[in-house]
């Protein structure tokens, strides 16, 4: 792969860097993993929640793992603040769509009050409305000074939601762009040219 998920895994200290350092708020993720994780919230592509628990119970459980213990009222407010309908708060997560599960993930991140959010393909498999709702939640978090690193193949969402865009290939950052200085059409062209050069390199190897 390009190395997007590997990059996130380095920040989470799931794997060790072969060289160099990974730092979060000035802390070395390898040398100070517990301190680093206090500043991080992570939402994987397939968020693992307990299907037999309600959205509220999942939020309270996972927030508790992060040292936060929202009461029922606070948990309900958090879930509704990310767009989960009030009648869904007390339903089992096994009845949730992927979009609803992602909203619980954002609520957990908000409950943790982490100032950095890592996302791995968060809009994969979402319908257009759910994807748009998720993008709006990210905008709100960014306005509240949360730094967001999102690994995605969705060029439209990258352009719409990001301030900076990086294109990776074979574990290397090939392009680093200011999202305000490139159009979606230009971004798509650059991405395709980058991927095409990779294919040619493989053929000519």
Label each region the model flagged:
Residues 152-153:
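H-loop/switch region of ABC-family ATPase nucleotide-binding domains
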Residues 128-130:
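Helix N-cap at the start of a conserved alpha-helix in ABC-type nucleotide-binding domains
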Residues 12:
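Helix-to-loop junction immediately C-terminal to a conserved catalytic motif
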Residues 117-120:
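Catalytic Walker B motif of ABC-type/P-loop ATPase nucleotide-binding domains
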Residues 20-31, 35-36, 175:
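Conserved ABC transporter NBD signature motif
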Residues 60, 64, 72-88:
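Conserved ABC ATPase "signature" region
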